[in-house]
Curated annotation (Swiss-Prot):
It comes from Phenylobacterium zucineum (strain HLK1). GO terms for biological process: translation. One of its GO terms (molecular function) is rRNA binding. This protein binds specifically to 23S rRNA; its binding is stimulated by other ribosomal proteins, e.g. L4, L17, and L20. It is important during the early stages of 50S assembly. It makes multiple contacts with different domains of the 23S rRNA in the assembled 50S subunit and ribosome. The globular domain of the protein is located near the polypeptide exit tunnel on the outside of the subunit, while an extended beta-hairpin is found that lines the wall of the exit tunnel in the center of the 70S ribosome. This is Large ribosomal subunit protein uL22. The gene is rplV. Part of the 50S ribosomal subunit.
């Protein structure tokens, strides 16, 4: 039996957004997540808008969701928000087959990923 994961507790100055089913591999998604980690949210949105990666559009939506959660649910100032964490996880793998020569078949795996973005309010001095 697998060990149950504990839910992450957010501090009072944090907000989070999760996207569970993104149709890309975790490796490709992590390239985009690395590019926004630690940036101010406005800078991160610009990075994602002008990124040439296909999945950057979905990560941008998730970041907007985290910003909205911070503003509406936690009453945080969106001008002082920083992308504190952006981490990627594996999800299910859709399996398909590809017909090959002599009646054989090969397996095609189409991976799904999930991303969690945590934004944190940074003080005025930072």
């Amino acid at each position: 039996m697998a060990k149950q994961a504990k839910a992450r507790r957010l501090a009072g100055i944090e907000a989070m957004a999760k996207v569970r089913t993104l149709r890309t591999s975790p490796r490709k998604l992590n390239l985009v997540a690395q590019s926004i980690r630690g940036l101010k949210v406005q800078r991160a949105l610009n990075e994602l808008e002008f990124s040439h990666k296909r999945i950057a559009r979905d990560v941008r939506k998730a970041l907007y969701s985290a910003i909205s959660n911070a503003e509406n649910n936690h009453n945080l100032d969106i001008d002082n928000l920083v992308v504190a964490e952006a981490f990627v996880g594996k999800n299910l793998i859709m399996k398909r087959f590809h017909a090959r020569a002599r009646g054989r078949a090969s397996r095609i795996e189409k991976p799904f990923s999930e991303i969690t973005i945590v934004v944190r309010e940074q003080g005025e001095a930072a």
